[in-house]
Amino acid sequence: GCAGCVISCPHDVIGYDHESGGYKPFHIEDELGPTDCGHGQKGCTSCTRACPRFRVWEPQANEHLFDRDRADDEVAGIYRSGYWDAVHTDILLTRASDDMVHQMGQDGGLVSAILIWAMEQGYIDGALTSYLEGGADSGSWKAIPGVATNRDEILAGAGSRYTYSANTLAYDEAVERGLSRLALVGMSCQSSIPPVMWSRKIGKVSKPILFNIGLLCSKTFDDSIFEELFEAKYG
């Protein structure tokens, strides 16, 4: 799960199982069951309004971001060449010009390069991203959410992840550290949280997220599957 409901809950009654076999939100007050968090009966709908897969979400996100829904021929979505320019332009194949950033990235280091530039220019003061548990040299496959506040921390989070990480869970840490201009790097389910929040009048939570980078994704894996795969292949 994207954890949009977790960071939006004003009553702190939604937790998140970020362990093998989990990766889903849950009610901390589990004795009340899945349909009653104790506050929902009183009219709180923050979690459902923050959920980017609840109700019709794509038109809502498009309306917030571009003031219109996309046309039938806009298969790749709505994109534009400038902030005020709604004219279609080419989709670009890019890579980082900094050799170190390029080498540390998975497919050219573009995301890392954008984050570094945005941070050095003062556009953002932190990024919600992911790291490998125990560090890049630990041999771990498990991805965990974290906050990057400088070039080294951004590069430490570069490269691919083969297990799920709800990067939005790093939001509370960022806010506690006093960061107020954030970038969010996440898969499509996570990157669709901020515009949906604004469209559904729960934008206060997503207000610090000024820069939203969505990564192409067809699926992701629970790290518990690797033990099964290795056992099946190598015995």
Where are these predicted regions, by residue range?
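Iron-sulfur-associated redox domains of electron-transfer enzymes in respiratory
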Residues: 56-235
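Iron-sulfur cluster-binding cysteine motifs and their immediate structural context
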Residues: 4-26, 40-69
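Short Fe-S-cluster ligation motifs
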Residues: 28-50, 83, 104
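Short alpha-helical segments and helix-capping/turn motifs at coil-helix boundaries
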Residues: 10, 28-35, 110-117
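Glycine-/proline-rich flexible loop or hinge segments
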Residues: 21-36, 92-101
